[in-house]
Design a protein with these regions (language model features):
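Structured catalytic-domain cores with a bias toward divalent-metal coordination
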Residues: 2, 6-127
Length: 127
C-alpha cells in the first residue's frame, strides 16, 4: 500500500502527465478483450528500457510474458488479467509503458524497479 501511494504521488507530480495523455495512449488495444495475440507485437516494439522475458507457460501452453523496467531499490510487482476477460488494466499498462519513455519518468524509474505481467491468465483471456 505504501509503495502504491509513493508511485501515485510521483505520477501526480509529474508536470505533463495529463497534457501528454493523448500522445501516450496505446491506441492499438481497442477491442473489449485482449489476448497474447494482441499484446505480443506491442511487447516486441518496446524500447531497450524494458527487459522482456517469458516467465512460464499456462496450462494450455500459452506464454506468460514478463517485463522489468526501472532500477530503483523499491521493487513493485504489477499484474493484469488474473481474470482473463478483465482487460482494462492491460490497456492501461500499455499507456503506462508509453509514458515510461518520457523524460518525466526518470525520477520514478530511478526510485523503483517494476516487474510487470501484462496477462497473468492467458488461457482465460482466450476463453
Amino acid at each position: 500500500m505504501f509503495t502504491f501511494v509513493i508511485l501515485k504521488i510521483i505520477m501526480l507530480n509529474t508536470p505533463h502527465f495529463l497534457s501528454q495523455y493523448n500522445s501516450i495512449k496505446a491506441t492499438a488495444l481497442k477491442l473489449r478483450y485482449v489476448t497474447n495475440t494482441h499484446i505480443e507485437p506491442l511487447l516486441n516494439s518496446l524500447s531497450q528500457k524494458f527487459t522482456k522475458s517469458i516467465l512460464g507457460t499456462s496450462e494450455a501452453g500459452r506464454s506468460i510474458h514478463g517485463l522489468k523496467v526501472g532500477s530503483g531499490p523499491k521493487r513493485i510487482l504489477i499484474w493484469s488479467q488474473m481474470h482473463g476477460n478483465e482487460s482494462t488494466t492491460t490497456k492501461s499498462l500499455f499507456d503506462l509503458f508509453n509514458y515510461f519513455e518520457s523524460p518525466d519518468c526518470e525520477v520514478l524509474l530511478d526510485a523503483c524497479t517494476l516487474f510487470i505481467i501484462p496477462i497473468l491468465n492467458p488461457d482465460g483471456a482466450e476463453a
